[in-house]
């Protein structure tokens, strides 16, 4: 783990706090979670949802999206300045599903954004509680990561679809703050930077004038965030070059894509947090759980414990497999879309299958889908064990440079080997080591070549029984060494389209 001297823990980022001790962090994260729960209960009352309807994940997502939209200042301002037909900039809404005469019915609701903001603030002791909003954004981002593929976005920015394991958080809004930046993968940051540089190439005024100065500050900040994710000196030095460039162009894009490829073996540190749907927090608050008093952590046992005793339902399309739908949501809840399936399956206590074998589409139901044939079923979100979420990227060898897998970004701090196809990855590095970053490139390639797939990551770390809340006796799983654990293997998921 990087030195904690200057870094705030990601619970602190998430709650916008300065440095606090563990108890204070647990309390402020608990306060944030409790606020989301209270807001959800109030919304269910407003909408007159039955207990069953309030536990429906699709209803939870609609309510979450409404509050995010109500607080999206920039978009609200834009909508007011550019009125479009049939869209009231002051209102927000979405589909709410109700059980009527044994059938699921869709009802489109509309609310004043002002009213939603009032309910949210009231649930959060009168504050704006931006941390809670970011938390909801990260849950949506984790759900997208598990559900959709970003092949098109990768190809558009000149990256390779096989780099999908670097794309965590690629659908997070820009306004998601420090907590959002912590969970973004290396590929996501590279993609944001490449898009920015391309705009600068096409638009002469992009870096000029007062606006250009702000753009430049944003560019350098993004470069620093990405630099902070890399764990080797050579990768960081290359990021300094990209950041200091007088006028960023194709050379910088090349460097960034080189760095993204290198991250397949020399992994970046990317935070993982278990962010659950609002209805889960609502259920717990309704049953009398005081999150602020008890304290809460996004990276420990708490989310597992919460999911052990919450019942959440989901709408199921006629030919979908409810077990597969459960797997999808379980992975989203634990931010495990890019984790090794062997690890996820071990923790969950059920076999976890690659996405290409899932008979399920996304959780959200499109407005043109036929409700007549919709059924609902219970999501199985419980686990056999729990494990600590990591942000190290799983490099062995004193956390410097070692093996990653072409398709894994570890979520859980659990001992495993990181199988990877060195040949596949190294093939991408033939030739181009000239230019001003040549010595860094050579150094990075040298480190990658000396990485061994059989090295063990997270040495001695294990999973814990759910009764072992203090994490005293780790159980270290043993895995078949050559079994590749990619979720994206044989992928046929839909593309993510806004």
UniProtKB/Swiss-Prot annotation:
Q: Where does this protein reside within or beyond the cell? A: Virion; Host nucleus
Q: What is the role of the protein in this entry?
A: Encapsidates the negative strand viral RNA, protecting it from nucleases. The encapsidated genomic RNA is termed the ribonucleoprotein (RNP) and serves as template for transcription and replication. The RNP needs to be localized in the host nucleus to start an infectious cycle, but is too large to diffuse through the nuclear pore complex. NP comprises at least 2 nuclear localization signals that are responsible for the active RNP import into the nucleus through cellular importin alpha/beta pathway.
> What modifications follow translation?
Late in virus-infected cells, may be cleaved from a 56-kDa protein to a 53-kDa protein by a cellular caspase. This cleavage might be a marker for the onset of apoptosis in infected cells or have a specific function in virus host interaction.
User: Subunit comment for this entry?
Assistant: Homomultimerizes to form the nucleocapsid. May bind host exportin-1/XPO1. Binds to viral genomic RNA. Protein-RNA contacts are mediated by a combination of electrostatic interactions between positively charged residues and the phosphate backbone and planar interactions between aromatic side chains and bases.
Show where the record puts the motif Unconventional nuclear localization signal: 1-18
Q: Which Pfam families match?
A: Flu_NP
Which GO biological process categories is it annotated with? Answer: symbiont entry into host cell; viral penetration into host nucleus
- At which positions is motif Bipartite nuclear localization signal? 198-216
**GO annotations of cellular component type:** helical viral capsid; host cell; host cell nucleus; ribonucleoprotein complex; viral nucleocapsid
Q: Which InterPro entries match?
A: Flu_NP
HAMAP family with a match to the protein in the record: INFV_NCAP
Residue ranges of the region described as Disordered: 1-21
Q: Which gene encodes it?
A: NP
Q: Which keywords, in A-to-Z order, does the entry hold?
A: Capsid protein, Helical capsid protein, Host nucleus, Host-virus interaction, Ribonucleoprotein, RNA-binding, Viral nucleoprotein, Viral penetration into host nucleus, Virion, Virus entry into host cell
What is the protein name stated in its UniProt record? Nucleoprotein
Query: What does the similarity note say?
Result: Belongs to the influenza viruses nucleoprotein family.
